[in-house]
Amino acid sequence: ADIAAQIVVDYGFSNVSVNAAGDVACRGQQSPGRPWVVGILHPDSNKEVVRTVELTECSIATSGLFERGNHILDPHRGVHEVRLDSATVIGPDGGLADALATVLLIEGERGMRFFAGLPDWSGYLMRGGRAFYFGPAFESAEQPRRDFPTQRSNT
């Protein structure tokens, strides 16, 4: 999505959002004074949004099992095992966001150590009907659905 968005920007369009199989790159604004709004889906439903985030000049990627099933291997043990239902990462690089989302899915909250020293990055982790989040993308007062409890993680 990052590469496609950059191509569009290089052609002179400064406001663009590209969705490439669920990974989204946002450049500029949706309309004057309004950032792009991207929804984070419920891990059990690809149609139900649990949280929205406002984005400019960044990318968002989610790893989970809801679309492609259990396709992710724990590299330490070589088995299909994850510690979260889904992991969403927001940051300046879409490829790294995708990789970090997969790491978080496998490592769970332990994977948040990879974010030390990455102040521009955010994460939204869901497991067992609860959400944990961190980073600047989630500093707004807006809250997710009331029946999907969340808690801010200290990183």
Predicted regions and their residues:
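Mature catalytic core of soluble alpha/beta enzymes
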Residues: 1-155
